[in-house]
UniProtKB/Swiss-Prot annotation:
It is found in: Cytoplasm. GO terms for cellular component: cytoplasm. This is Phosphoadenosine 5'-phosphosulfate reductase. Its EC number is 1.8.4.8.
């Protein structure tokens, strides 16, 4: 696999970019997660960043990438509405893994947003999308720009939802390379990695949560529910960071 030219690829239409990366992705599918990270660091341009929501299985990608690339900037977009357990989990993992944490937030505080727009998450899909744009998408775009990122690692997995089922290991999103090292891992592999490396699930895992985001749009799993139905009232799966 040869090195890729980000600028040249960004000039192509989206379909052509996908085709241009197809051969590389076919080879990346054959590598393990560590191999994919190592390949990306050798062949894709820096600066490198890793994003994390510090959700249920976040310790896996945080540990895996940070072991290979210590001090990689870890981007967290903090909405101000995370669970108390999440904030404590962030502190715990940051200390345990010696993370180079970079926290980005909306330019408007949570209270100011509610005063201006009301509770956007109660205003259907359009309200949720506006909320996500303000609290997730804009802060992430700002983070990528300020950190001069050209290669972005994330911990998405195909098993998590229908919207992620066909994602490749390597893509271009927001003008940068996006690498998903554990995209093909199942829940069993996640569990084994956590056990092997002395890592924990998010504290709310033990209380019945399969996915954790904001307090107002996250529900416990109940029999018959798909994982994606536990977020955003089942109206949508993605928070906006991994769309487009």
């Amino acid at each position: 696999m040869s090195k890729l030219d980000l600028n040249a690829l960004n000039e192509l239409p989206k379909v052509d970019r996908i085709l241009a990366l197809a051969e590389t992705n076919a080879q990346l599918e054959k590598l393990d997660a560590e191999g994919r990270v190592a390949w990306a660091l050798d062949n894709l341009p820096g600066e490198y960043v890793l994003s994390s929501s510090f959700g249920i299985q976040a310790a896996v990608s945080l540990h895996l990438v940070n072991q290979i690339r210590p001090d990689i900037p870890v981007i967290l977009t903090d909405t101000g509405y995370l669970f108390p357990e999440t904030y404590r989990f962030i502190d715990e993992l940051t200390d345990k893994l010696k993370l180079n944490l970079k926290v980005y937030r909306a330019t408007e505080s949570a209270a100011w947003q509610e005063a201006r727009y009301g509770k956007l998450w109660e205003q259907g899909v359009e309200g949720i999308e506006k909320y996500n744009d303000i609290n997730k998408v804009e802060p992430m775009n700002r983070a990528l720009k300020e950190l001069n990122a050209q290669t972005w690692f994330a911990g998405l997995r195909r098993e998590q939802s229908g919207s992620r089922a066909n994602l490749p290991v390597l893509a271009i999103q927001r003008g940068v390379f996006k690498v998903l090292p554990i995209i093909d891992w199942d829940n069993r592999t996640i569990y084994q990695y956590l056990q092997k490396n002395g890592l924990k699930y998010h504290p709310l895992w033990d209380e019945g949560y399969l996915s954790v985001g904001d307090t107002h749009t996250t529900r416990k799993w109940e029999p018959g529910m798909a994982e994606e139905e536990t977020r955003f009232f089942g109206l949508k799966r993605e928070c906006g960071l991994h769309e487009g």
